[in-house]
Amino acid sequence: MIGCHCHTDRSNIRLLDSTNSVKELLKTAVKMEYKGLAITDHEVLSAHLDAIRTVREMKKKGDMPEDFKLILGNEAYLVDSLEEVRDNYKSGVTKFPHFLMLAMDPKGHEQLRILSSQAWENSFYTGTMERVPTVKKDVEELLSKDPGHIIATTACLGSEVNIHLLKIKAFEETGDSQSIKQHKLKIHEFITWCIEVFGKDKFFIELQPALSEEQIYCNKKLIDIANGYDLQMIVTTDAHYLRPEDRAIHQAFLNAKDGEREVDSFYEACFVQNVDEIHERMDYIDKEVIDQAIKNTMLIGEMIEDYTIEHEPIIPKMELPNFKLRHLFKPAYDQYEYIKKMSESADEQDRYLLKLIEDGFEEKLKTSELTREAFHKILNRINVELGELWEISQKLNQSMSSYYITVREIINIIWDDECGGDSLVGAARGSAAGYLVNYLLDNTQINPMQYDLPHWRHIHKSRPDLPDIDIDTEGSKRQKILKALRERFGDKRVLQIATFGTEGSKSALQTACRGLGIDNDISQYLSGMIPFERGSNWPLKHCFYGDKETGRKPIKEFIREVEQYPNLKETALKIEGLTNKRSSHAAGVIIFNDEYTKSNAMMKTPKGAYITQFNMGDSEAMGSVKFDLLTIEALDKIRVTLDQLIENNEIEWQGSLKETYNKYIHPDVIEYEDDKLWEMAGNGEIMDLFQFSTEVGHQSVVKVKPKNLLEAAVTNSLMRLMSDGEEQPVDTYVKYKNNLNKWYEEMTRYGLSEKEIRVMERHLKDIYGVADTQEVVMQMVMDKDIANFDIKESNYLRKSIAKKKEDVLKEVEELFFKKGKEIGTSDNLLNYVWNVQFKRQFGYSFSLLHTLAYSIIALQELNLNYRYNPLYWNTACLTVNSGGIDTEDTKDNKKTAATNYGKVASAIGNIRQRGIKIDLPDINKADFGFRTDINNNSILFGLKGMNGIGDDVIHHIVLNRPYSDFNDFIERMFKSGIIKKGQVIQLIKGGCFDSFGNRQEIMKAFISLISEPKSKLTLSNLKMLIENNIVPSEFAQEVRFFRFKDYISKKVYKTLKSPKDKLFLLDDVSASFYNQHFSEDSVVDMLNGQLVISEKAFKKEYDNKMSNIKSWITTEEPLKKLNDCLLIKEWEKYADGSLGKWEMDSLSYYYNDHELSGVNFAKYDIADFYKLPAEPVKGKPYQWRGKTLYEYETTRIIGTVLDRDKNKHAITLLTPTGVVTVKQWSGSFSHYNKQISRSIGGGKKEVIEKSWYTRGTLLMFTGFRRGNNFIPKVYKDSIYNHTVCRIDFVDNEGSMSLTTKRAEI
């Protein structure tokens, strides 16, 4: 049997559907003794290449029979008319029938790609459901041109034929013969259409072995249809999970998206069933019929070719302009073989590349100033690089030149500020920086010969691969760049690359919790305990079982917490790694020579962006060549700075963006040497310095205090390396930089001879004896005095040491020592090189070409701060961090990035520490983003940086300016409905109206406006008066009567219609009060000894008793008191707290005093973090596992939470003296970070206590300082009992009201 209808987790990209990975599905098929399997995901082909590779690997390992047949298909949604289902959609009525198509050969697969791309082109939403219909007419037109390449089947209960059969079933029960006749006609039309389009021998009726009443009915009718039209039948299981034991996990996975979804019965039979299970489930049908249907699946297999959709890479070719090669290098042609070959090449792409090289040579290298020696050195480098291109082109049988020409064209489009991307382009990224040809073409901006960068890291004939030139751009211009590329090359030739999101460890645990009905607060708490290391969370397997290779131990606390919830562990482990969504790759773009369906297929992201159906690796394997257009915020910040400088006449616009950039900050024109420039870096003065803005980066650049570009690049590399010992590589570098003799002492300790030390000097002296990059490692092993590796071997070593896999490392280590000993290298030198210099890069290794290029971008930022007032740069950083720049700058579509409030708040805190003033946002002056005020040496806060305002409101505020006073603003903006109450309050809190008067008085005026005071009172307002303690004591009895009436009104026994009345049943307590204060006139009955009274009769007596208080209520006194109370409540709701609290709520920083500046620091032993020793002070010793350790002296700090990093378990705290990072261990962080709620029924819950790490929370931490971090810690015998306390209130004496424990339910 062949499973002709099976789903993988790629079916999950629109709606959670399947828990089958490709590999496990195929393994299960083999286990169930299938002879083949079809991949038929829901309108997506993405799993096909993965399946091809998996089958190949399994056959190679002997895990799958050689004759196992893989079939590639698609389950489409086949409709009669797009307009009908889209424009006339009716929920529950409009159907999108399922339909199965299987490709018989490569042509059939191309047809699937075309149809699937058309379906995605047709896509639209009905509510939150994304529809991707395939129109019958499109199928007809396509297959009529070249029929016979696709097999079709009727699919599942959701198919057109089964939809009509189930309608017939319903009408049979009601006896509606006319409707039955109509649906039979529809079935006939559908069947005959399928026969006409696909052919009778390529269209099959599909039966399925589900036990539902509907499936049994349809199966019987489908047999009749097959016999009536002389069609073949097949049996499929529509596998969405692997085996019955996976059913509960599949149910939990699907329910995680929609808890109300009924999935268990619907998918009851949707697993990989063996033949016996199929027979057992279909025992109501003749065995011979089922046997033949099973046999027919093999018939389908015989009709399908064995083929692959893989293809050699197809390099895009640009249409070239008319050009003439000037033969600038002709006098040296005979000396430089490959320059001559390119000049005489039959391929015009080669000749055009050489023409561009000639242009760049004259423009960039100032040929008139070159000596003969320098001239030939450059020509030799060009010749070597062209030689690599030429030889690889011969091996690939296509011109590599076209790749470089295409990259140049893309970069020109990106630079174009008139009809292109209007974006800066980064100096270089990665290995492309090592190629002189790239520099001459303007593909990079760095002359590699100036820095002795090796060309062979980019491409080399020993590894005939395509080059990979990554391009950095402004993040805010990405959509504009993509639009410009589509306009240049055509919509059908440009696609962004797809990426498929998977269930990581955190999301898998959270998904499992949702599916199993475990509260979200618990889910967040548990997932917060998963460690985060080197940019990613631990896999769940490592959390539960540990991992020997990485040295990770099981997390006992995590295991203990998870195991409290049945099936959570098993479900989460199974879900982890499953595909759950689609999106566009952050960088990858493919430019096709032909329409994309020739080698790929198109789909859309949920936001409508056009992307490939295959991920990057698969797309490349199918022949596509990708171009990585990456985005870095540094370029956005540089661009905003340049725009400000132009606006303030500090620099002049040069007619284009590129020419302006070239004049002022191109790497060829910036300052490299000035000591003051490097002091700014070493002192940590530059905000968000590229590559050094993280905590580690900032610490490293301050430690190293680089004096030149090379030292900055080394710092950039070494700060990423980690040592097993206490001294980290960057610390070793600093030590040797300050005293190079210590490096020589190290080499002497390892027994190196004078000659061997000279060898080390050759490679390491310029970088103070610390091998920092891949290139240094490769050059050392290629040294004839060390190991004499060739390029291929050194490249293998580079890749191997970066993986930190014991078996791979051992293999390359043996090769290194073997080759070294063969050429006579001493054990001492080999040991020193391997165990000291190389060891630092085990597990992680960085490239010099990348760090140097990126350090140049940092240097450009330094230049902007050095040459111009740093206010411009600081303002640009705040603007970009706040999302205050357009992310899509097209005529019809303006968007802005989300504000990173925590990052903005931290940056403002750090800026103010350096004495820079941040002015409050003035309603008539503040821009969308932050703005430099050079005259006042300050930065004006940008409206985008405010909490709770919103882009649209900001645009309206700016559009309607100026405002003459606060009332003018209210009349035109608030009363007109443009701006909401909460947004006005945020503007007031943030000081936007301070120019109009006192902030608190303006707030009072607005609160008075919105508090809606009562104009008069009646007895119906008595409850409100009582709640606010306004009723005088003289009316105490009336208050009791009111509460009595309120109480019995909830005890309705019976409602009478005629005469209209309600009867109240009094309990013992209320009956006693009634008998004491009211007459029997209202009593109408007794029920089991309890009084029953009439509401109508009671009300007369009640109103009479309430007459005095009723008169009082209508007087001025209670009205004034109640309105005063309402005003106070509105104030407490919206405007409680100090000005500092207002500013934190609105701006996330304190313009005035910190909320905690009045705390009695001495009373609570609170320290200024910045005056604490940088390293913890040792205190009392103690023994732990045979070692002597020390307690550290602890103290306290206080501050306001600005931000939290759930991965790094860190809190950004604004203390009264500056911003501090507090770092906790995962369990403690999760404990204080979790939200605590309780169920209140009806699927709802109320929050008992928010996370303590919510922005704006005031906290006190106990612990010690380590470097730039504060580490919470208390000891058993310490005077402090808690690492974290929440500060609830500070009184006038500086005493704090503290909460020391989390709330309990």
Curated annotation (Swiss-Prot):
Single annotated GO MF:
3'-5' exonuclease activity
A UniProt-annotated Pfam family = PHP
GO BP, one example? viral DNA genome replication
Q: What is its EC number?
A: 2.7.7.7
User: What sort of enzyme, by top EC class, is this?
Assistant: transferase
The UniProt keywords, alphabetically, are:
DNA replication, DNA-binding, DNA-directed DNA polymerase, Nucleotidyltransferase, Transferase, Viral DNA replication
Which reaction(s) does its UniProt entry say it catalyses? Answer: DNA(n) + a 2'-deoxyribonucleoside 5'-triphosphate = DNA(n+1) + diphosphate
Which Gene3D superfamilies does this entry report, sorted A to Z? 1.10.150.870, Bacterial DNA polymerase III alpha subunit, thumb domain, Metal-dependent hydrolases
Does the UniProt entry include the keyword NAD? Answer: no
Q: Give the domain of life.
A: Viruses
Q: Which SUPFAM superfamilies match?
A: PHP domain-like
Role of this protein? Replicates viral genomic DNA.
Q: Which family does it belong to?
A: Belongs to the DNA polymerase type-C family.
> What is the protein name given in its UniProt record?
DNA-directed DNA polymerase
Source species, please?
Answer: Bacillus phage SPbeta (Bacillus phage SPBc2)
